[in-house]
């Protein structure tokens, strides 16, 4: 087959000379040297570009690069320069810790030791520990001035909102909302915002807080009605494509996920409304999207039947870089229980000594009254055990001890908890409220 045209031209230029073989050998040597010494080859290329004049013929450049193999001096210079750069580069140690479950061998061993300490304490010992250390515990040097100045915005007069950690609303008609930041050293990202269930007088404040803090998740641990009593205002639309309006806000349900047996997850679109209708200014404002997690049928001042549902919820909200808003009715019992489970789990995953009593005391210094009953305190331990069992941490020889703990736990619940009827979910969405009903 005849060679291409450009190949014929190249052969014509080099025919009759004895340099073609030498050039091929040089090209092969250059490729070999480039693969072995890429730094040297790059340095030579830059040096040639600096020394070459615009009028200099290309043949001169080829003569300057005839020596392709580096000398021992060049090799030692390159090695020394590379070593010097490595020594000058700061050493950064990256901590790779699984923050979702005990996965490494050291995490699993540390987790197992804690579970053994729970079995040694027993159900009765845990209840006694709560009564002795936490039942009457209040943090020292607390102030409640904002709480006392806003009685109409507090759901319960005996559930105090601390001044030191309260969420302050900005660019709003008031700076007060019954909500506190809960941030500890072990909690990931921005921690939690623990708050009471929205009221008719605070529902607009609630949505303003969600937008202000750019919260990506809302965890609701109560029903709007429980045992015939209102525990929380209907502040979000339950069904897909339904809309609920409040003065200044329009909330739309973008989708509902009911695949979990315990929780209902809704994707909500929150838009600010600056007039009676969505005017041109309102349309230009970007909507805020938030996932709403509703835990069905967690009894007030009690404990739910599922001990693994907390970890499923926490795994969904943990990746967010913004604080997670958590509320029940008062925002201290069920809310504090979920936050305590996360704080205890993260302490164990970081392989730090865990004292659950001290964890609760630290949480109460930010959100007072965290965990209201000894059963909720016991539920924290039970969930941590369940997590260890489902991860296969418990050996077979601890099976009998684990079953005894479960029997004692169930027996205590049977004697302490009265049978409570479950409040059914509403069959249809509530009507759109009027601004008069919600004096925000």
Enumerate the predicted regions with their spans.
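Cys-based phosphatases of the PTP/DUSP/CDC25 superfamily and their flanking regulatory architecture
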Residues: 1-440
């Amino acid at each position: 087959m005849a060679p291409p045209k450009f190949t014929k031209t190249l052969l014509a230029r080099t025919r009759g000379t004895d340099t073609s073989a030498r050039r091929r050998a040089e090209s092969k040597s250059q490729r070999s040297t480039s693969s072995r010494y890429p730094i040297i080859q790059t340095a030579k290329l830059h040096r040639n570009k600096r020394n070459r004049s615009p009028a200099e013929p290309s043949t001169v450049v080829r003569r300057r690069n005839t020596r392709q193999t580096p000398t021992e001096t060049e090799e030692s210079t390159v090695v020394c320069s590379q070593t010097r750069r490595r020594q000058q580069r700061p050493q950064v140690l990256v901590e790779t810790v699984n923050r979702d479950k005990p996965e490494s061998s050291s995490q699993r061993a540390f987790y197992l030791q804690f579970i053994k300490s729970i079995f040694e304490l027993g159900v009765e010992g845990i209840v006694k520990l709560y009564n002795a250390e936490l039942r009457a515990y209040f943090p020292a040097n607390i102030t409640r001035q904002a709480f006392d100045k806003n009685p109409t915005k507090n759901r319960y007069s005996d559930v105090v909102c601390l001044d030191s950690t309260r969420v302050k609303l900005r660019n709003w008609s008031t700076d007060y909302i019954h909500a506190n930041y809960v941030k500890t050293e072990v909690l990931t990202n921005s921690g939690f915002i623990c708050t009471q269930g929205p009221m008719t007088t605070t529902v607009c404040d609630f949505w303003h807080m969600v937008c202000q803090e750019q919260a990506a998740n809302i965890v609701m641990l109560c029903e709007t009605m429980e045992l015939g009593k209102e525990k929380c205002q209907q502040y979000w639309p339950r069904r897909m494509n339904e809309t609920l309006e409040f003065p200044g806000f329009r909330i739309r349900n973008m989708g509902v996920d009911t695949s979990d047996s315990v929780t209902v997850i809704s994707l909500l679109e929150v838009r600010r409304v600056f007039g009676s209708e969505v005017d041109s200014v309102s349309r230009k404002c970007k909507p805020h999207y938030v996932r709403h997690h509703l835990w069905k049928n967690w009894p007030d001042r009690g404990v739910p039947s599922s001990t693994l549902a907390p970890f499923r919820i926490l795994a969904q909200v943990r990746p967010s870089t913004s604080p997670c808003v958590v509320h029940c009715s008062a925002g201290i019992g069920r809310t504090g229980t979920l936050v305590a489970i996360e704080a205890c789990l993260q302490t164990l995953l970081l392989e730090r000594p865990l004292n659950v009593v001290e964890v609760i005391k630290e949480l109460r210094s930010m959100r007072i009254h965290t965990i209201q009953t000894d059963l909720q305190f016991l539920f924290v331990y039970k969930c941590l055990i369940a997590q260890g069992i489902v991860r296969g941490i418990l050996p077979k020889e601890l099976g009998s001890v684990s079953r005894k703990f479960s029997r004692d736990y169930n027996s205590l619940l049977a004697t302490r908890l009265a049978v409570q009827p479950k409040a059914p979910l509403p069959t249809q969405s509530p009507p759109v409220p009027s601004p008069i009903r919600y004096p925000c």
